[in-house]
Design a protein with these regions (language model features):
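Solvent-exposed loop/turn segments at secondary-structure junctions
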Residues: 20-23, 66-69, 93-95
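Membrane-interface soluble catalytic domains
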Residues: 47-55, 103-163
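Hydrophobic, well-ordered secondary-structure elements that form the walls
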Residues: 65, 86, 136
Length: 163
């Protein structure tokens, strides 16, 4: 349905949701099938996008509002953790196979230099969702558009994740 809406021009963006990841107990047995389902869903999305001839116009952003703790709780679950990740996918993207950001041995975010994208505890900053969204908006050419007028990110470090 989403790919058909893109193909017809009815929409240029959509949110797709897969739930069940909030696993405060029996984490592994719940996450394993969810991750497999997610992988299959992403693969199917790209297959349909190819079939509909729109794959070269899609930027897929995959993320979550929070991560899971690096350790298990007393019920073999994992609780909320402020460190998450975002995956960006695009057909024939010039910025493929990059990992930007890092955590220390305690799974705490390390500071990243916005210019070099390397670990820099002195001059860097922790990457937050606002940095990713600002960079994606710029990449898509909507950073200073009327769409963003009341939703701009001010006083935010500027990362060029797509260089």
């Amino acid at each position: 349905l989403t790919a058909a809406a893109f193909q017809s021009g009815l929409t240029s963006a959509a949110d797709l949701y897969i739930g069940g990841f909030d696993t405060h107990s029996t984490h592994d047995s719940l996450h394993e099938p969810l991750l497999a389902f997610s992988t299959d869903a992403i693969q199917l999305f790209w297959q349909i996008a190819e079939e509909k001839g729109i794959a070269d116009r899609v930027t897929l952003v995959i993320g979550s509002d929070f991560g899971r703790t690096p350790h298990y709780n007393s019920t073999d679950g994992k609780d909320h953790w402020p460190i998450g990740s975002v995956v960006l996918m695009e057909k024939n993207a010039p910025w493929t196979n990059k990992i930007i950001g890092n955590t220390d041995e305690g799974h705490n975010a390390q500071k990243i230099n916005p210019d070099t994208l390397e670990i820099d505890e002195k001059n860097g900053t922790v990457i937050y969702p606002k940095h990713v969204h600002k960079a994606v908006r710029r990449y898509l050419g909507i950073e200073n558009s009327s769409v963003e007028e009341n939703l701009e990110f001010t006083n935010t470090e500027d990362f060029n994740f797509f260089a």
